[in-house]
């Protein structure tokens, strides 16, 4: 009985410490830009030069096929729109984050995420975005948007996210 009481006290204590302020929304998926997305103002969303506008109106994520890093037609359409916005807003440095689903080894998925980010980088450069503004990074399977064992989840995690890291102006 004493053990059950201690377990109940520990559970209540942990529940009281829970943070309900918005939490982490993985960068770049469904408008996510990181911590506390609820702090985006309507003014930022309506400013066509803002990071919030880019994420929510232009879109900052492209998805990939299983075990692939080749851009499909919908990814190219999304990147054409991104390139147009990036050319109109030259003051930003861009970080391209490559991701993979949970299948495969850590090392394999880091390499795959890097190849996905490179594919996006090459496409944006071909559309006129300066390569000096673009940096690539891979998280492999380390930062999933969703964790589950279905193709629907895996599909969301096979992505490259375009992050506007800073304004140069």
State where each predicted segment sits:
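C-terminal motif of bacterial Sec signal peptides marking the signal peptidase cleavage site
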Residues: 13-16
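Periplasmic peptidoglycan-binding/tethering modules of Gram-negative envelope proteins
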Residues: 18-93, 166-169
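A generic structural micro-feature
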Residues: 152-156
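A non-catalytic structural micro-motif
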Residues: 91-99, 114-145, 158-169
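Short beta-alpha junctions and helix-cap segments that line functional grooves
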Residues: 146-150
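Extracytoplasmic/secreted proteins, especially bacterial periplasmic and envelope-associated proteins
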Residues: 74, 78-81, 107, 115-119, ...
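Sec-dependent signal peptide recognition
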Residues: 2-9
């Amino acid at each position: 009985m004493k053990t059950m009481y201690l377990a109940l006290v520990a559970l209540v204590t942990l529940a009281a410490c829970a943070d309900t302020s918005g939490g982490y929304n993985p960068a770049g998926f469904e408008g996510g830009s990181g911590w506390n997305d609820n702090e985006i103002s309507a003014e930022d969303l309506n400013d066509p030069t803002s990071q919030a506008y880019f994420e929510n109106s232009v879109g900052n994520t492209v998805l990939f096929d299983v075990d692939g890093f080749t851009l499909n037609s919908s990814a190219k359409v999304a990147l054409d729109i991104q390139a147009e916005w990036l050319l109109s807003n030259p003051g930003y440095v861009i970080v391209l984050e490559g991701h993979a689903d949970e299948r495969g080894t850590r090392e394999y998925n880091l390499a795959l995420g890097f190849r996905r980010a490179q594919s996006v980088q090459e496409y944006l450069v071909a559309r006129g975005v300066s390569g000096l503004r673009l940096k690539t990074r891979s998280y492999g399977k380390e930062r999933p948007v969703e964790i589950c064992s279905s193709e629907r989840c895996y599909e969301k995690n096979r992505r490259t996210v375009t992050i506007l890291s800073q304004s140069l102006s």
